[in-house]
């Protein structure tokens, strides 16, 4: 009902819930609140700023979600929901929260042109194979698109990325992506940020004309 501001931890966990309409007053959803339910889609209202760990985790039926623009804390919110495919972001979103889609089943993502920052581990251990980072993005968080060897060797992994020259701050965003071979560097690059391609499978890269600086550990542990 309208007026509810918080849904507690494990409130509906393991139930047969297939559909839920969340009130516009809701600001916080607790850990495991809807985990292992039968939800097919979820629209998070603009008011939601905090989602606990695995609040929507391990939901085999969940395929679509709408993310509000003010969501700031949501680490591991969809972890284990392996059939999550369709992501819609509310207009005006500027940051994709830390760990938001970590360990979920998404295989493709369209990042809105309003986004300037992608958070720590936001897409770690997902199934994304090709990635286009829009020109608006200046910061990629640590391990934002990384992949862990002990997570699952059977999952598809990143093979191609297209990056804007506006990137200023990165920290091993693609670490562990050993199948990453194709990199497109768009725009007028002056600096290759620190750690950008560390721990990747990149074997060949043409450094653009105009680059005057390569940051520390930019290619550390890669296949170059």
What are these regions (language model features)?
Residues 1-6, 15-28, 37-50, 60-72, ...:
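Structural signature of tandem-repeat unit edges
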């Amino acid at each position: 009902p309208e007026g509810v501001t918080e849904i507690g931890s494990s409130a509906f966990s393991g139930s047969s819930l297939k559909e839920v309409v969340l009130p516009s007053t809701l600001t916080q959803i607790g850990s495991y609140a809807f985990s292992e339910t039968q939800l097919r889609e979820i629209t998070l209202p603009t008011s939601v700023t905090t989602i606990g760990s695995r609040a929507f985790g391990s939901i085999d039926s969940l395929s679509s979600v709408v993310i509000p623009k003010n969501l700031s804390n949501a680490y591991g919110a969809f972890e284990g929901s392996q059939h999550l495919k369709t992501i819609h972001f509310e207009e005006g979103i500027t940051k994709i929260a830390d760990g938001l889609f970590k360990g979920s089943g998404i295989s493709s993502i369209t990042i809105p042109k309003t986004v300037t920052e992608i958070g720590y581990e936001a897409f770690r251990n997902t199934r994304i194979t090709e990635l286009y980072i829009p020109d608006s993005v200046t910061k990629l968080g640590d391990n934002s698109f990384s992949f862990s060897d002990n997570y699952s060797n059977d999952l598809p992994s990143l093979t191609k990325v297209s990056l804007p020259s506006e990137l200023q701050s990165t920290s091993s965003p693609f670490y562990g992506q050993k199948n990453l071979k194709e990199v497109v560097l768009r725009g007028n690059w002056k600096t290759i940020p620190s750690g950008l391609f560390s721990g990747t499978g990149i074997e060949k890269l043409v450094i653009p004309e105009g680059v005057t600086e390569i940051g520390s550990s930019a290619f550390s542990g890669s296949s170059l």
